Amino acid sequence: MKNSAPACDIPDLGPDVYAQWRASGIGATTERLEGRLILELVGDVSGCRVLDVGCGDGRLALELSRRGAIVTGIDASAPMIDAAKRRAQQHNANVTFQVAVAEHLPFPAEQFDIVTAITILCFVQDAAPVFREIERVLRPGGRLIIGELGKWSAWAAGRRIRAWLGSRLWRRGWFRTAKELRGLAERAGLVVKGVRGAVYYPRWGLAARLISPFDPALGRFTMIGAGFVALSAVKPAAGP
């Protein structure tokens, strides 16, 4: 990808890493909170054509399909797409998966009612082309739900430390504030409807257990310390 680090080029990231993360206590809690927020923002998807950009191993795509959406998932990583296809087969889900990059979506204009993009921009230095492509494939009135790693949180600080210590994964990481995400969406021609936060605890199991019950309430009132930032936006309807 131009100006980016495709997931397939990063040896630290793959289906097994995702599975290990979800199997941990803090990973399961974090996935639950992030997933609940994204699904709340996505809302009713019954009959909608949905594109999941950076679908990973297909977990969100399959949940959207289960809720009645017609789902296509793309990812830059062939191993991730293979894992997503296996997951779909295991669950007898009718979801289309293919290898593609977010900067060059292989779809006609105005193809989708909803686009989801979860934690992909953290591996993209120049995110503007991604937003432009998403705007292009959305139909007028279509919606974008994007979730990203927060820039100012205990989690982000830990990732920066790991980058300084030599992590190949986080040395290529790019974190953005809610304001920066809002600006990218608006410059692409989208109208931002809201920004919410999640994951207000540090990467420590006890803290997660103590704070996670209050996480949804915190996400409605402040972005300070959010480890996960979710933005919803809409493509303006065509004029008369």
Task: Locate predicted features.
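A C-terminal cap/extension of S-adenosyl-L-methionine-dependent methyltransferases
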Residues: K193-P240
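Short catalytic micro-motifs in class I SAM-dependent methyltransferases
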Residues: T119-C122
